[in-house]
């Protein structure tokens, strides 16, 4: 099936930062695109980091530009970037984040949502997961039938194992032949 032949599946990838979508499930996004699925990527935080030399408005614009370039390479036609403060989603009222996510869920009407694992070390990743879990809770006429959490390399594996929140994947997507 080519991208021109739509499969009817609608996929939302909702992440905290620019690049999380690629690190977490870039190959899976590409596979969905090639299967004819419509994929939306929603980025919540502005991408400014606390690392020296990587902050400020210029860095934010560069991260957004890089996110758009990555979306173009993957074939993603729908990209939304919000400007919640990076590494400070825990300072934002959770309800504000949930409302943004719920608005996207209403607009996209996805059957599947991909996001961060709840036990990730990064607070923004955990907060994003929490907001999505709330926004995608089962309700009558709710479109989301599957929510999948991914590992974010360089973040998830640094978390100390804590039983139920340890990342233990049970869903795998074979991307070995995905161009």
Language-model segments: what does each one mean?
Residues 19, 45, 67, 79, ...:
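Divalent metal-coordination and catalytic microenvironments
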Residues 7-18, 22-58:
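ATP-dependent adenylation/pyrophosphate-handling site
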Residues 24, 62, 96:
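Short, conserved clusters of charged catalytic residues that mark active-site
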Residues 42-43, 83, 148-151:
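Short beta-strand segments
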Residues 45-48, 83-86, 117-119:
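Short, histidine-centered active-site or binding-site loop motifs used for metal coordination
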Residues 1-14, 31, 35, 54, ...:
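Metal-dependent de-N-acetylase/amidase catalytic core
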Residues 47-79:
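Glycine-rich phosphate-binding loop and adjoining beta1-alpha1-beta2 segment
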Residues 25, 64-67, 128-129:
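A general structural signal for well-ordered alpha-helical segments in protein cores
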